[in-house]
Amino acid sequence: MSKGPAVGIDLGTTYSCVGVFQHGKVEIIANDQGNRTTPSYVAFTDTERLIGDAAKNQVAMNPTNTVFDAKRLIGRRFDDSVVQSDMKHWPFTVVNDAGRPKVQVEYKGETKSFYPEEISSMVLTKMKEIAEAYLGKTVTNAVVTVPAYFNDSQRQGTKDAGTIAGLNVLRIINEPTAAAIAYGLDKKVGAERNLLIFDLGGGTFDVSILTIENGIFEVKSTAGDTHLGGEDFDNRLVNHFIAEFKRKHKKDISENKRAVRRLRTACERAKRTLSSSTQASIEIDSLYEGIDFYTSITRARFEKLNADLFRGTLDPVEKALRDAKLDKSQIHDIVLVGGSTRIPKIQKLLQDFFNGKELNKSINPDEAVAYGAAVQAAILSGDKSENVQDLLLLDVTPLSLGIETAGGVMTVLIKRNTTIPTKQTQTFTTYSDNQPGVLIQVYEGERAMTKDNNLLGKFELTGIPPAPRGVPQIEVTFDIDANGILNVSAVDKSTGKENKITITNDKGRLSKEDIERMVQEAEKYKAEDEKQRDKVSSKNSLDSYAFNMKATVEDEKLPGKILDEDHQNILDKCNEIINWLDKNQTAEKEEFEHQQKELEKVCNPIITKLYQSAGGMPGGMPGGFPGGGAPPSGGASSGPTIEEVD
């Protein structure tokens, strides 16, 4: 295949989306199911690996081996409180591998474990394939988005996932920034405008304030809640209906994973319905112990169940405004992103907060981020189209970065919301006389003391010549590149001795070797998936051939046209094959093909003989001649047209 354009991928917590900029506009690409967003789900079964809709659709049957929310694990430590609290809610198992979380599943009868980067890479591979199927070209370059909240290791983990999926990640950009780009193309303005991006998706909530002036974006502030989204609204509905089931039927379904999963699917559907209707019905046959669950819910009740969550979305809005030092009256445009912003109550709360201001809903909220990422991909790969030419992008660091100084104080070198790329240098000294070295501990966070912030990594600068405290000069430099990835170095001015940090694995980093191994494994899994598809196709081919043959010779119009002995031979062989199929569902492709050849050896001569003697098949035989080689029709006009049926 020829080389295709760069794409933009919104790798979401619950759903992902891919877009491409071509023919002067962005096209959001639908998957093989016709959906423009694809669930970020990967499932493992005894026979195959499923990604996307196929994985999500079978989750009720296979909850422990269906993995989602990998984005919540990426770039985190196993003992991270977020990981620990999330694990309680997941039906799949997360294990500790040298301090890093891995997802453990049963796949093809074996226990396998995968890093979150590998799971995310499978979703990215799926998005890459969706784009390739649509474009008819290979896709290698991509811009991938992350929440504004993501720290350094989460960004790096996302980049690693791209590498494992065989993508060249041109840049990692913040989701709100991507939405702003999507928006910037729609509405060109000269004067400076302040934009508030309100992004409420399936799993995360981000509020960002940006300014746009003459096509130049600047992010002023970000705030949000990494744990609020559509799934939380689904959970409230699920709990409501579990309680209702208990009241009506005196039975508790909460311990039955499959029942809860089926209920959750119905709740998600009801929630979507309630964005356009004021009432939704739920009908689940045999939900628990054979009891059918038929009920309904009104929009008002749904709003009441989620009232605190809905209202709570305004707190980060206020925080973002404070950080940007803006009053709400100074916001020119409010942009809705994420499927949950379709909820009328959320739109109303936001509109009322901004004193009745109209909200911008012109961009499909599920697609806005991928849309902007696709534009950014076009810019970075040198698209000369005037639509993208005058667009420039300034991103920011989501959290302040600094080092620990005497007494555990956080000394900030780069303040949060600093435009990146950026580089800051500050000079430090020793704390005690004749101190031989300094420990540089790098933190991110907004608290005054480092113990309340997040340690990114540490390194030592040793070999400082003996000197009284306060004399040595140690220059510390923080350098952040355009992807938000941080390098920290320290130099002793007197000796020129330098050390810099490679933020190591205890930060949730994958080593080069790990990534290379995972790239190879990803290839292997892909090959296995294809082999599985071929196998199923030969199995189905044999299956339908045997059944069609059997149907042909059992046709009541046949007696007298075929020798009893031949008739019996075909029947015996067909039954033998059908029995063999029942016992060998998981045989190899070659075995299915071999069995089909054996069956054809018996059937073809007899059927050919039948045709030649009868001058064509008797009419009314279903579906024409079912088989491998189509023999000549004996020239009789009464016979059906013969076609191959696979």
UniProtKB/Swiss-Prot annotation:
Disulfide bonds: none annotated. Pfam families: HSP70. InterPro entries: ATPase_NBD, Heat_shock_70_CS, HSP70_C_sf, HSP70_peptide-bd_sf, Hsp_70_fam. Keywords: ATP-binding, Autophagy, Cell membrane, Chaperone, Cytoplasm, Lysosome, Membrane, Nucleotide-binding, Nucleus, Stress response. ADP binds at T14, Y15, G202, E268, K271, S275, G339. CDD domains: ASKHA_NBD_HSP70_HSPA1 (cd10233). GO terms for cellular component: cytoplasm; cytosol; lysosomal membrane; nucleolus; nucleus; plasma membrane; ribonucleoprotein complex. The keyword Chaperone applies. Residues 2-386 are annotated as: Nucleotide-binding domain (NBD). GO terms for biological process: chaperone cofactor-dependent protein refolding; clathrin coat disassembly; embryo development ending in birth or egg hatching; embryonic organ development; gastrulation; protein refolding; protein targeting to lysosome involved in chaperone-mediated autophagy. It is found in: Cytoplasm; Nucleus, Nucleolus; Cell membrane; Lysosome membrane. Molecular chaperone implicated in a wide variety of cellular processes, including protection of the proteome from stress, folding and transport of newly synthesized polypeptides, chaperone-mediated autophagy, activation of proteolysis of misfolded proteins and the formation and dissociation of protein complexes. Plays a pivotal role in the protein quality control system, ensuring the correct folding of proteins, the re-folding of misfolded proteins and controlling the targeting of proteins for subsequent degradation. This is Heat shock cognate 71 kDa protein.
